[in-house]
Structure formats: C-alpha cells, structure tokens
Amino acid sequence: MTRAMHQVLLTCATMLACLPAAMPSASAAADGKRVAMFMGPTQDKYLGALSKSYETAATGSGMKVTTFSSPFDPALQAQQIDDAIAQKYDMFVVQIISQRAIIPVLTRVKNAGIPVVLVVAPMVGNENSAQDLYLTHVGYDDTKFGELIGEAMLKALKDTGRAKAKVAVLAGSMAEGKAPLREKAFRDAIAKHQGFEVVVTEDVKWNPAAGERAAGQLLARFAGQGGLDGFYGMNDVVANGAIQAAEGAGVKVGTTAGNLIVVGGNCQAPGVKNIGTGKQAATLLMLPVEEGKLAAARTKDYFDGNKPQKITFLPTETITKANIAQHAQACSY
C-alpha cells in the first residue's frame, strides 16, 4: 500500500468515526405493519378524504393499509372485520357503523389480540365493557358540535326577528354514535329558549339526495302549520339538499327576515359556497385530512411502544359569513 493510499484510508476512517451512528427510522417499529381500515362509504367526500389522508400518512411510516368500505351496512362491516381477523392484521382502524352491532364484533377482535383505533364515530356508553374494546379514539366532539350549531341556529333565527320557530333536523346515520350525539345536543340547545323547538328529525344517513327528498316532504307537511323556520343538515352536502328542496318549493332561503334558515356541519365545499352567497347561516370546522393524519400518528405511537391517550378531540369552531374566508380553502375538499 502506498503512503498516499494509506492517508486516504485513514482520512475516510476518521470521517466515518466522526459521523453519528445511523439513527433508526422514526417509523422503524411501524415498518411493514399491516393495517385494515373499515369505513362507511368512501364515496362520501369526508370519509374519502379521511381514508386517503390516513393511508398517505401511515404508508409514509412504512405501514401497509387496506381499506374496506361499507354503505352504512353493519352486517357487511361485521363480515369484513371477521374476514380480516382471519388474515391476522396488526391493527384495525374502524368507523363504527352501528353502536349495538359493533360490540360483539370488536369483542372478537379483542380476543384475537388486534388493537383498534376508532375514527369518526365514538364508542357510546359502556355496555359489555365497550370502552375496553378499543385502544384510542380520534375525532371531533359531537356533543360540542350539536351545541355550537344549535347556538348558531338560534342566533340566526333571532337575528331575523323571530321570537319562536319550528326547526327540522336532517340527520346522519342514527344507528352510529355520531348523529345521535349531535341531534341530542342540538335539541337541548334549542330547547333552552322558549318558543323555539325541534319538531322532527329525519335519518337521511348523510345522503344529500335523501336529505333533499326529506326536506321537500317536510316543507309540504308543515306548510299548513305555518311552515318550518329552519333546517339543520348535519353536514354541508345534506344542508345543501335542504336548500335545493326549498328553492324548488318556492321557499326563500337566507339569513334575513322571513327566510328559511339553514345550518350545516363538517365545513364542506357546498357550505363554503352557500355561506358566501348568504343561503346558509353557519357550519362547523371539521377537517378530514387532519383527522386522518392524527389517527395515523396514534397508530404509529402504538407500534413505537407508546400508549396513546384514550380519546383525542380535534379543535372546532363555528363558521359564518364573518370568518368563512379564512377557512374556505381547508373546507373545500
């Protein structure tokens, strides 16, 4: 070996010795883990965006994600989960389709030793130790949602000079945990004010076409009783269905005296547009991309050997024409 070659090797060795040891990837523990995700209909813009966000974040940490979709069919979801148990996935991410039907299913999951992350809908109550059937829940506080949008409805009604009002609810799926929590909190908020009442709730399963049909039928039904004063569509596409039905029936929608008041939720593109044009009074901040990212982070936490906190609620706020501009981009998914 020449003196020059010896010097080169010595220099290289010195440089390598000075470099820090290769750090294991932050996702090393999660690398290669197989995750099965069970969602409602991913054609729904919120659920589709959440699923995509979760998969992108989890895949970035080395996980392999398979998504199963169900059209709010608890029997199909149970079958999908049972099939996945047999395939020995490392983690399940579940949107509860039916509170009652999911308990025996998740009991089988627990007995198989597979941890569960809940998204979208919470586990309600503790029947058969239901709160022990999942590792962590990531989502939004639906009771708070109902309260906030109820207060927004009341403000909009009172701002038009009304001293009393009849309001209808176009609900998401009442079999899951989410819609019933919102509906009850909304009713409670309205009931605090004498003369204001929720007169009917229709379960439209988050479907805008079903929401439009139900709204049209309710407008006709209450026409002989002085009419309805407001609609609460639990997401903005359902609220948009109510607006379409009202306009089709010749009922003026807006936020001024004599108008039908419509509020929504989940801050979606139709809501951004309708608030901007004055046809919708309010919505609530709810971002599926952020929910998906956080659920993936909680999954990674578990694989990294950490114990995620039991429940994590993302922040929300009421959105009206006064602040729609600052949220329009994030809500237009």
PLM regions and their residue ranges:
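Extracytoplasmic "Venus flytrap"
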Residues: G32-S61, T66-D83, Q87-Y89, V93-Q99, ...
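Hydrophobic alpha-helical
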Residues: V94-N111, F186, V199-K273
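Hinge/cleft segment of the Venus flytrap/periplasmic-binding protein
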Residues: D31-K33, L170-M174, K178, A189, ...
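Periplasmic-binding protein-like
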Residues: A36-F38, K88-I96, P115-V119, V169, ...
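Hydrophobic alpha-helical segments within soluble ligand-binding/sensing domains
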Residues: Q77, T136-A165, G211-A215, C267-G271, ...
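Short beta-strand elements in bilobed, periplasmic/extracellular small-molecule ligand-binding domains
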Residues: T59-S70, K166-V169, I190-K205
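Short, solvent-exposed amphipathic alpha-helices that sit
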Residues: Y46-M63, F145-I149, G177-F196, A214, ...
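Flexible loop/hinge segments that line or gate small-molecule binding clefts
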Residues: V105-K144, K166, Q268-G276, A281
